[in-house]
Structure formats: C-alpha cells, structure tokens
Design a protein with these regions (language model features):
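Conserved MFS/SLC helix-loop-helix module at the cytosolic interface between two early adjacent transmembrane helices
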Residues: 63-109
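C-terminal ends and interior cores of transmembrane alpha-helices
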Residues: 86-105, 302-331
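Intracellular juxtamembrane helix-capping segments at the cytosolic ends
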Residues: 124-138, 349-365
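Helix-loop-helix hairpin linking two adjacent transmembrane segments in secondary transporters
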Residues: 139-140, 144-202
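Hydrophobic core of transmembrane alpha-helices in multi-pass small-molecule transporters
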Residues: 105-125, 323-352
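Extracytoplasmic
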Residues: 11-43, 130, 240-248
Length: 425
C-alpha cells in the first residue's frame, strides 16, 4: 500500500513538473502567434495589435493574482490545481477555435479570449504548483522545484523555436491553424495532468490559523519600490525577446532577413534568450550563497542597460552569426549584432525575479504572504510594457522602442542600489 502511494505521488510530481513547463509553454505562444496576426490585412503589420494576445495573457494576473492565493485556502491544493488545469485546457482550445471560426475580426476576438482564459490558468498554476511540489516531494521537494524551474526555461526556449518552424515563411495566407500541432500538444498535456491528479490522493497540509493582526506590506517603502520593480521586470523579461521576435521576422521594417527564413530564424534566436535564462539561473544557484541579492541585482541591471543601449545604436549592417533552423536543417545564419546583444540580456534577467523578491520582502515578517499575492498581480507588467514598447515600435521603429526597456532597467537598478533599503513608508 505504501509503495503504491509512493508511486502515485511520484507520478503526480511528474505531472506538476510538466505543468511548470506548461506555464512557460502557454505564455510564450503569444509573441510568435502575434507574427501571424500581424500579417492579417486588416491589422496591417501593427506590432501593438500583434502583441495584444500577450497583453490579454498577462492581464489575467491583475485580476486573478490575489484571488488565486485565496483559492488555495478555500479549495485546497488538489482542487485548485484541477481548476487551473481545466481552465488551461479551455483557454488553449479557444485559441485553437480561433483558427477555424472564420475571418477577421471574429478570429482575432476569439484568439484574444483564448489568450485571456489561458492567462487565468497560468496565474493559478503559478500559485499552486510550487506548494504542491513541496507537499508531494517531501525531503526532495527543493530538488523537484529546481527541476521544474529548469523545465520551465526549456519550454520557454522550445516554444518560439517550434512555432517559428511550423509557420515557415510568413505571408498574408499564414493562419493560426498553422500552429495547431503545438496547441494539440498543450491540450494533451493538460488533459493527461488532469486525469493523473484526479485519481491521486493528495491531503492538504494543516493550516496554522492566527488571530494576530498582520500589517500591510504596502506600509514598507522598500516593498512599494519592489512592487514597481517586479512590474517593470516582468515587462522587461517579456519585452526583450517578444519585440526581438517581431524585429527579426519583419524583413521590410526590421532586420532585413531573407523572408523565406526570417520567422524560423526569429523563433530560434528568441528561444536562445530563454535558454540563457536557464543558464543564468543555474549560475546564480551556485553563487547565491556567496554573492548577495543586492550585488547580483546591481550588476545584472547595469550590464543589461549597457547591452540594450549597445543594441539600439548598433547598425543593422553590423552582423554576426547565430545557430538557427532554416527549414532544411540547422545552420549558422547572419543576424544583426543587436540580436545577439539582446539575447545576452537573458543571462541578466534570469536572476532578477528572485533577487527583487528577496530584497522587497526583507523585514516584512508575517506580511510576506500578502506580499506574494501582490507580486503575483504585478506580473501584469509582462503585458503592459511590451504593448507600450510595440506601440512605440509602430511609430518610431523597433530599436527606439527599447528605450522602454532601458527605463525599466534603470528603475530596477535604482531599487537595487537605494530603493531596497528596509524602511517604512
């Protein structure tokens, strides 16, 4: 009996790890699918409208960030996870329907609805998967969480690559149905995870209730700065590769790549950014015991600012080679140097969430749980900043739009250097 329970728990752990990967998988569908939407004649190449799916995905965090935490208390870990998985399946299915419902604007509206529903799922999954792994994993829970984080980064790497390969050459005839295999994979993983968790017995941990009044974390000035920093960070993290994907895919106003390979190249280059985030997290895990969060955040913020400004002022004619899938195989392809510089920012952004969180909750005590819910709501920055950036890209060009990223990084640097000092507002 004990062995059967252990095997069931291990299967549930695997399901949770796959769901951590699905968080990144579903989130990173938005930018490459945005390339397809941009080609709709009615959208006329608008980067801002192409980024609307990403916006809807992250908008859900502002609505669901704090309630998702309350669901854990009200419904328990298992029921919350099952609800999140079911909502995720529905969200991806609605996105699939957008490829078959007809022409613009109906297909566009249905797609945005699907992205919004998926955002609710991803928000709930972000809230429940790590506590579930901690509960199911026992003494090995931290190891499982680290494996899940690595799988999350791997999915972030593969998603734009896979979507880019499926789209092939971007034309006015490109449609969301071109990426149906990716949507089928997502629905399959959600369905399998739901079935597994449905039949695995999971007991919720005992909740320690307290009558002690918990002070609002917003009374701490450094936490307020940290909330702003998290909002900007998620926007920076998403905006750098998302806009880079648009830039490389755009053969006319962007990087000037061969149209027959531009989208595939863009997917692989953007995917490399997420791969470097994985590398950065691994490096950070080794040095975090010796290098403080303040020092790490200060250094990576400064380096990221230098890389982005360098990329902005690097001529398109200055090129370098990066590996990419061209349709017939993997090759070294020529891309603007700016693309490589922006990809390297993945090493910098990889450690920002953890270090900002660590500095922002310093000295909060019992208010830390409330702080976590506020942070989850601030993930909406991943939708707002990229939308603003691509609105500017439509008006002034791709590279000038990265001033939005520089501004965000500048505030994060301020937070690391001065704003993180523990002090009540």
């Amino acid at each position: 009996m004990a062995k059967t329970k252990q095997n069931s728990s291990f299967i549930a752990v695997l399901a949770m790890i796959f769901l951590i990967g699905m968080i990144s998988f579903v989130t990173n569908l938005a930018a490459p699918i945005g390339n397809i939407l941009k080609m709709q004649p009615q959208i006329a190449g608008s980067n801002a409208l192409g980024m609307m799916g990403n916006m809807m995905n992250f908008l859900a965090y502002a609505i669901m960030g704090i309630p998702a935490g309350n669901m854990l208390t009200k419904y328990g870990y298992k029921r919350t996870a099952l609800i999140a998985i079911a909502v995720g399946f529905i969200g991806v299915f609605v996105q699939f329907l957008s490829g078959v419902v007809g022409s613009f604007p109906a297909n566009f509206i249905v797609y945005l609805l699907g992205a919004f529903i998926s955002g609710f799922s991803v928000c709930m999954l972000n809230t429940v998967v790590n506590p579930m792994l901690k509960l199911l994993g026992g003494k090995r829970s931290n190891q499982y969480i680290q494996i899940g984080g690595s799988f999350n980064s791997l999915m972030g790497t593969l998603t734009p690559m896979l979507v880019g390969a499926l789209i092939g050459t971007l034309t006015a005839q490109s449609k969301i149905a071109d990426v149906n295999p990716v949507l089928f994979i997502a629905m399959g993983v959600f369905a399998l995870a739901f079935i597994i968790l449905l039949f695995v017995p999971i007991e919720d941990p005992d909740q320690v209730k307290t009558t002690e009044k918990v002070e609002s974390p917003l009374k701490f000035r450094h936490f307020v700065y940290g909330v702003i920093a998290i909002f900007l960070y998620v926007g920076v993290e998403v905006g750098i590769p998302g806009t880079l994907n648009f830039y490389l895919s755009d053969s006319v106003k962007g990087a000037g790549l061969d149209p027959s390979v531009a989208v595939r190249t863009a997917g692989f280059v953007a995917g490399t950014y997420w791969l470097l985030m994985l590398v950065g997290r691994l490096v950070s895990s080794f040095i975090s015991g010796k290098v403080s969060s303040k020092t790490q955040l200060t250094c990576v913020s400064m380096v990221a600012i230098i890389l982005v400004i360098w990329a902005m002022f690097s001529p398109v004619s200055t090129q370098t080679s990066m590996p990419a899938f061209t349709g017939s195989g993997f090759e070294m392809v020529k891309v603007p140097l700016s693309a490589l510089l922006l990809v390297l920012c993945g090493l910098c952004t990889s450690v920002m969430w953890g270090t900002i969180f660590d500095l922002a909750v310093e000295g909060l005590g019992a208010a830390t749980n409330k702080a976590s819910g506020i942070f989850m709501a601030m993930v909406v920055g991943g939708g707002i900043l990229p939308l603003l950036q691509n609105f500017i890209a439509d008006k002034a060009g791709y590279m000038p739009s990265y001033w939005v990223i520089v501004a965000g990084l500048a505030f994060i640097l301020f937070f690391a250097v001065a704003g993180s000092k523990v002090k009540k507002a």
